[in-house]
Regions:
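Beta-strand-rich N-terminal accessory domains
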Residues: 1-109
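Extended, loop-rich substrate-binding clefts of extracytoplasmic carbohydrate-active enzymes
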Residues: 101-165
Length: 165
């Protein structure tokens, strides 16, 4: 992951190539409502305000909107997308590496062009970087433009009210 044009990502941030899975993902020893597996990302949302999560694949996949309720499910129709026209060539992608393949998912989304998954850390289509309360997606080797997406969850010391929005 080059990350060269986006200097504000701290070097201590956790980083992973976009969409790259794990050979041996960690699994908990017993069922837990906290650990849904390896495809988690930094939550979006303030303390006590509910949250939505976006994984290193780019999909929105968990949320805690109703107090005490936890849902982990890929929401394929909720995606960022990019249209680029460069040198009379159009490039269009939903910025997630795959659609929801679960039963009862929206099959019409299979027509979407999903962002290419990184083949390896060295042969990457970009990177996901996380250091709470921020995370970044840096998209590389696909678009002509340099593209990144930064998310921020509000945390203010000694100010619970603004931290809960």
């Amino acid at each position: 992951m080059k990350n060269s044009f986006y200097k504000s990502i701290p070097t201590c941030a956790w980083s992973r190539a976009i969409g790259l899975g794990w050979d041996k993902p960690y699994t908990v020893r017993k069922d837990s409502n906290i650990d849904d597996g390896p495809w988690h990302g930094i939550p979006l949302g303030g303390f006590g305000a509910g949250c939505v999560g976006r994984s290193s694949r780019g999909d929105f996949n968990f949320w805690h909107i109703d107090g005490g309720e936890h849902t982990f499910q890929n929401i394929s129709a909720s995606q960022f997308s990019v249209f680029e026209n460069s040198n009379n060539k159009n490039v269009v992608y939903a910025l997630s590496t795959e659609a929801n393949t679960e039963p009862n998912s929206n099959a019409s989304l299979s027509a979407w062009k999903w962002y290419p998954t990184s083949a390896s850390e060295d042969d990457s289509t970009g990177g996901y970087h996380a250091l709470y309360p921020r995370s970044w997606f840096v998209y590389e080797n696909v678009f002509q433009a340099q593209l990144s997406c930064e998310q921020f969850s509000p945390v203010w010391a000694e100010n619970y009210q603004e931290s809960s929005y």
